[in-house]
Amino acid sequence: MSSIHKLLTGIYIHKNFLRPRAALPPFVGNHCVDYSSSSLQKKVTSVDRASQQGKTEEGLQGHDHKEVALDAPSPDRTPEVSFDKAIRDEAIEHFRRLKDEIVAHLRGPDGRPLQEVIMEQARVVWQFREKEDLDKWIVTSDKTIGGRSEIFLKMSKNNRSALLYGTLSSEPPQDGDSRQSGYCAMISRIPRGAFERKLSYDWSQFNTLYLRVRGDGRPWMVNIRQDTEFIQRKNQMYSYFMFTRGGPYWQEVKIPFSKFFFSNQGRVRDVQGPLVLDKISSIGFTLSDKVDGPFFLEIDFIGVFTDPAHTEEFAYENSPVLNPRLFR
């Protein structure tokens, strides 16, 4: 007599023969009929057989009622796409934005009355109060060139500040060319107007950069780019250092614009000149202190203000040999 293996899943398997019941739908389960000796089979009367068939038909009818018909799209049908309508809607949106810019310009700088702007002593340019404020920034690291540094930007737990964190690694990429690496940066997006025109910030009435930050004691480089040409030179910027104290307390950082020095591709240039404050394109923060490990920088807001006690125009000297245009 053959042995019968009964599984807990309701599948009956004979070790010599397997035959699935084709009448049952797939979702009912797999049942295999066993062909064992007649002495082990239960005698089924005609009444029991009729009742079992009735139950099976009722179960199949119940499953038929539960089936959901899905509307599968026909392969012959193609989605209707109107490029003319899309272009027209895009043009209408840009013209609407252009109209708003013209109306705001006629009202005054930044759409505010001129008297209010003249009397303004401080202005918050960037603050972090909701997740949409993070969309105005870009984070990058040497990972884009094969390095191992990582940087992330998110809102803090109380949604009242931005948390910039990650891991700095000075290990150069294994490309056979790079000898040094290890930087992480956070850069503000260039503002755009109607028809994707580049806009700029006008800080000409202010003389100091004002930040409220909380760090881990690492030094950061604050970079300001100015938009004075039709083609923006991304490697040319004005830079200055920002030193964080570390610890749980916030610190207010005030950097006069006269302290920013001109650099190109990370090198301080011999020819220096003051920062043009009415054509500010973006601001950024760079960490590259060659100290491997985790870091963080929490930022409450970034703004500008006028310090009446600061009268310096430019902190660095120029030689007529290096920059003769300033001495004509």
UniProtKB/Swiss-Prot annotation:
The keyword Nucleotide-binding does not apply. SUPFAM superfamilies: Galactose-binding domain-like. Residues 44-80 are annotated as: Disordered. The modification Phosphoserine is found at S319. Part of the mitochondrial complex I assembly/MCIA complex that comprises at least the core subunits TMEM126B, NDUFAF1, ECSIT and ACAD9 and complement subunits such as COA1 and TMEM186. Interacts with ECSIT. Interacts with ACAD9. At early stages of complex I assembly, it is found in intermediate subcomplexes that contain different subunits including NDUFB6, NDUFA6, NDUFA9, NDUFS3, NDUFS7, ND1, ND2 and ND3. Interacts with TMEM70 and TMEM242. Belongs to the CIA30 family. This is Complex I intermediate-associated protein 30, mitochondrial. It comes from Mus musculus. The gene is Ndufaf1.
